[in-house]
Amino acid sequence: MSNKYDIFISYRRVGGAQYARILQLMLSQRGYRVFLDYDELKDGVFGKKIKAAIQEAPVFMLVLSKNALDRCKNDDDWVREEILFAIEGGKKIVPVNPDKTFDGIHEQIPKSIREITDIQNSEIDFGQALGVTVDLMITDRLKPVLGERASEKHKDEDGEAAQVT
């Protein structure tokens, strides 16, 4: 049985939503099945569906935009809950530092999620080098977990469909 999703994207809505949506688009164009709560949770059943999606996806991608972890000191913070669930589930965690905006782990971040500081960030350039940096992240971080895609389709600079194999 195959998973419904390859990648779950976790992000802080303020400061991270635009990065998460671009990552979802780029990864989907390359053949990955991506869960993004903004698109998937239209009916308001939040917690149960979030946890089910994290459980389904082998990769947990964490968008570390500026101040992304500031509210993780609160027990009821959803980004914190998502990170904890991914850690407990043994997911491959891929922190993404968009445009080098992440300002680091603060002392008030709970020890239970502090282990993400030991994981190397994937720095994604959301400017002209977007495609190149996403492809590098795929090669270095996703393919070892998810394997090769039979056909990874995405658009080249001209907007034409391109094939990467």
Language-model region placement:
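Glycine-rich, charge-decorated loop segments at or immediately adjacent to ligand/cofactor-binding or catalytic sites
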Residues: 101-114
